[in-house]
């Protein structure tokens, strides 16, 4: 290995390997109508009526304040085009994580998906979990190809043993340069409930809520047949209420994305790094904000997401 590659960050090397893997898939296929050009940002492109797709996601989240931290989140999804304007899906969510001296003041801190676990401050911890089952519906009101701008509404309920969520989105899309340049924006409002220790009642647990409010944007340019590349920006906010009050965290992420869409399949990879723009809020956990980055249990330094789908 050259000195240059030896010192390259691991997430960057992994993204490079994924790009080379996708390049080996060939260049002669025709892109499908609903191919997912972004890892985190949704577009208004839907499956045609009667079309079906199996999609697999894998997200790696890496590096906290110090110590050891890795989390893998998986999603296995089946999608169906009810009509040219309505798409539905059903999927399973699962996760694995490990942590050691990664949190505020050097304490071992599990990620949010495992926040119901009681872990000692000096423990070497790891665990796997079935998070829950999700349903999804996307209804497109406007198409960027016939109306000049795309507009769609998204709803996704999730139910699991210790987790509940109702995620909603407004999706906007605008294309330029004969549809070679795709831009998209998502607004997300997602109240969620976790079954956690109840601070007011010793030895008891209760459903406790928070709300995620996110503003995400992306652009992608088709630079060759079936190939596109661009950037994604993810801005996440957490509130200990159902409205814009009692904010605990805000994180800002930015990075490249690359996409290959074949006749019957696609693969997309997105790498994000947290930007040093975070600030303390009224409910921010003490010690979680370091050098302008937030490292509470749902925030980390790097994220790498790979999505692959097959159409039939």
Segment roles from a protein language model:
Residues 1-12:
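N-terminal secretory signal peptides that target proteins for export/translocation
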